[in-house]
Amino acid sequence: MDEIIACLEQKVLLLTKIWNLTKQIQVRCTQEEVELDQFLDLRGVYIERVNKCNKLIQKLTRDLPADQQKHLTHILQQEPIDEKLCVSDEERQIVKLTLNCADLLQKAGQLDRSAREILTHQCEELKEKINQLRKAEKNPNLYRDTV
């Protein structure tokens, strides 16, 4: 159980970093010059690490006896759990960390959706400006020969 708790603690740290990066991405999306490459790359690295934590947790869970495996799988489902089902402090800690992970994922997801909406809106505005410029010109070709 200690290894699973360590993985969940690591996952909370990584998800916190993802959430913080997503906040920065959202702020950057509102600026005139949107440069997100380094943020997206770093967030991708953290997401890969979270996936590794998930795989290790699954492996460690599979290595448990069948009854413990079923019980722990239920606890890790990220659903509201009756703490009376937890038979040890370790299980209560696992529930707490699992719920913390779910909360961080939800927050990061909301910010990500917001950033995407901002970028989509900006893209639509730019398309509209380009279309207006094209209509204002007699020649719809944006790239005129100046020779």
Tell what function each PLM region has:
Residues 1-52:
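Long, hydrophobic N-terminal alpha-helical segment
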Residues 69-92:
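Charged, glycine/proline-rich intrinsically disordered loops and linkers
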